[in-house]
């Protein structure tokens, strides 16, 4: 709940990410009236107990009793919720209270739950700041506090608990060794400690923008900041949640030269330049491989060894010459930029380019680092392809109906500039998950870039936020549509996607998110590619052209749907900050459960293994049918014989005279006597066998019986009377 009193003590700065997140879902920005406050004024963030005690006595007198009770209940809910899920500000205050001897300039960057191994395991939390590593544990009032300056660290090593579980980190100084275990995200913590340690050895300090960028990547966009936090600096990129208008004021696509952008995209980041000098002096010792953990991907981004055990020692000789970071938006992330995505930018050297415009756009805005889903050439103009995909066209309406999207609302493109436009879409997607909701609302934001007003090609970045699905506040997906005009009636469509995280989930949750999200993304864009191909075919048929000849000459090249490797190219952030604000509907977690709306053609893309399995299943079905027929035949034969026997008995003649009955009785007596004689023989044989067994048991008993000891045979003297 939000308190709208103008003198609240919990007012966040104008650049706070919580304000930007609330303004994200509003309609397109309009010029504010003269009565609205300036951008530098404070905006209310939440209600607090102090907000009702300072300068609001006049306002409280006009409020109703029910309103005040509602606010009081909301405060109670916030109190216990803050205890269970403390904000970054609360964690930072706890950090300063626990480690009061540290310099006041030290600010918490991230904290992890872990345990210190001594005589017993001391469960606590590990706190990381720019220059210190701190640990605090409190077990039944037994407090343990450790503070290690990063410059004093001599060795940083990954370890295994009990030589089996890869969840430990060992930090060594000249005098002590500290063994921390029970990490939930060991590799990510090791990577951040290593980068902070590397920065301390190089005597590099973080700028406020770089520090807050790291804080946002570790704790998300909601930090719980107030107006008292004057040192807050909003980074340029908040994992794609920044305002496109605000980022567009920093960088305009039309002002970037193709050559400069291409050179800038290939220039290594400050982290890469320093790592290139530090890594040759590092001694690495890997014990045994541990490639099963999900966090090992983050370890590979740093160019380190991918094994589960890794030792890093500091540089023996000082590094005197260091290149200064380049100026510009790409250097604002600084040497400790932990990108929200785990992959690097896609290398666009393999993409074919027929015109200079395609090369310019590819150099300015390369593919996203996730997966390339569509890379096709269509025999239609770039303008027409853009109208089909990004306007209220019959093609888009039919496609959304096939995907069973409802409550579709398309806002018009903002007309500020033809080179930089933006619009917001809202709709509802179906979900076939039986345990979850049946539908989910989606808010999609699309940002369009052009090289010029008359340019045929364009780039559209989209981002989507799906509400009402599991872990909706942890991630979102980004998509980039690149439409390149190759000729008058020929254009290329490239669509790349990636999953971006606002918070860092557990490895199990992360794998679940990626599995379900990529399944929905691939299904959506494969469907879109097929529908575009159908529309192209209809267009060619209406034009009276030879469809077969033209379609056979179409050059279609699709890349395999695989993750980009970390070492395919230089490690550098996206040159355009607006690319962090892209998203699409199919990338949500619920898209995996959406009903498929279009059936594929017969024999389209059927692998050989599926054909073999189908043949085996057909053979098994035939064998089962044959076995069923045999069993049915045997049962029918048995019933036939039984009916014949009963029929024969029914047609037989019964005895009529006394002589015939006497013969039957004599036969019966004879049969009875034979049976009695047989049973007597069986009983006699049984008795004989029992006698033999009894005799054998008696002999066995005599053989194992121990003889009694001999009695004393000496004669006893007789008592005689004299």
Swiss-Prot record:
GO terms for molecular function: cholesterol binding; cholesterol transfer activity. Cholesterol transporter that mediates non-vesicular transport of cholesterol from the plasma membrane (PM) to the endoplasmic reticulum (ER). Contains unique domains for binding cholesterol and the PM, thereby serving as a molecular bridge for the transfer of cholesterol from the PM to the ER. Plays a crucial role in cholesterol homeostasis and has the unique ability to localize to the PM based on the level of membrane cholesterol. SMART domains: GRAM (SM00568). Residues 93-160 form the GRAM domain. Residues 565-575 have a biased composition (Basic and acidic residues). Its main location: endoplasmic reticulum. Residues 1-62, 256-336, 561-600 are annotated as: Disordered. GRAM domain binds phosphatidylserine in the PM and mediates protein recruitment to endoplasmic reticulum-plasma membrane contact sites (EPCS) in response to excess cholesterol in the PM. VASt (VAD1 Analog of StAR-related lipid transfer) domain, also known as ASTER (Greek for star) domain is a sterol-binding domain. Gene3D superfamilies: Pleckstrin-homology domain (PH domain)/Phosphotyrosine-binding domain (PTB). It is found in: Endoplasmic reticulum membrane; Cell membrane; Cytoplasmic vesicle, Autophagosome. It comes from Mus musculus. PROSITE patterns: VAST. Residues 578-594 have a biased composition (Polar residues). It holds the Pfam family VASt. It is a single-pass membrane protein. Keywords: Autophagy, Cell membrane, Cytoplasmic vesicle, Endoplasmic reticulum, Lipid transport, Lipid-binding, Membrane, Phosphoprotein, Transmembrane, Transmembrane helix, Transport. One of its GO terms (biological process) is cellular response to cholesterol. The modification Phosphoserine is found at residues 265, 269, 273, 417. This is Protein Aster-A.
